[in-house]
Amino acid sequence: MDKKDSLRLENQLCFPLYACAREVVKAYRPHLEALGLTYTQYISMMVLWEEGQVSVRDLGKKLHLDSGTLTPLLKKLESKGYLKRSRSTTDERVVIACITEEGRKLKRAASKIPQAMTQEMSDFPMEDAQNLYALLYKLLGMLEVSNEKQDFSKKNK
């Protein structure tokens, strides 16, 4: 590919990733609107359903969200009664998000979403989905390492 072609939209790896991410979120929307959730709120609740409680810092790392996005999102979920935030008893600087009984009830209501999404994407062969999943996590891991190296070198200049 010559330099002129390198700036064409269809030659960018980032574009189909971006477009697919948007389309996936769009496909989730009707299911999540029925629960009064956004996609980002949904994945935040997924972490709480798995772990019960988590530090806000660790939640942000796991979901690749900064505090500017996470704080208002958690406030909204807390106002709905799905979680409770509190300071750690061992370190006042650490804020812990803990699932509530209402949050557990929400899990039961949301339990049909993964199956519904699988059904909506049933034309996409399972083997392709598994390969894509593996490749995306491989790419994500590589990018995380690369970005950490860049962040480290910026801090040490």
Language-model features: where?
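C-terminal regulatory/oligomerization modules of transcriptional regulators
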Residues: 1-5, 127-157
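N-terminal leader segment of winged-helix/HTH proteins
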Residues: 1-35
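Pre-recognition alpha-helix immediately N-terminal to the DNA-recognition helix
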Residues: 16, 23, 43-46, 105
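Short, locally clustered residues in the helix-turn-helix/winged-helix DNA-binding domain
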Residues: 18, 46-50, 111
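Charged, amphipathic alpha-helical coiled-coil/dimerization segments
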Residues: 25, 75-137
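Short capping segments at the starts of secondary-structure elements
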Residues: 51-55
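Residues within helix-turn-helix
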Residues: 56-57, 68, 75, 95
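The alpha-helix within a helix-turn-helix
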Residues: 60
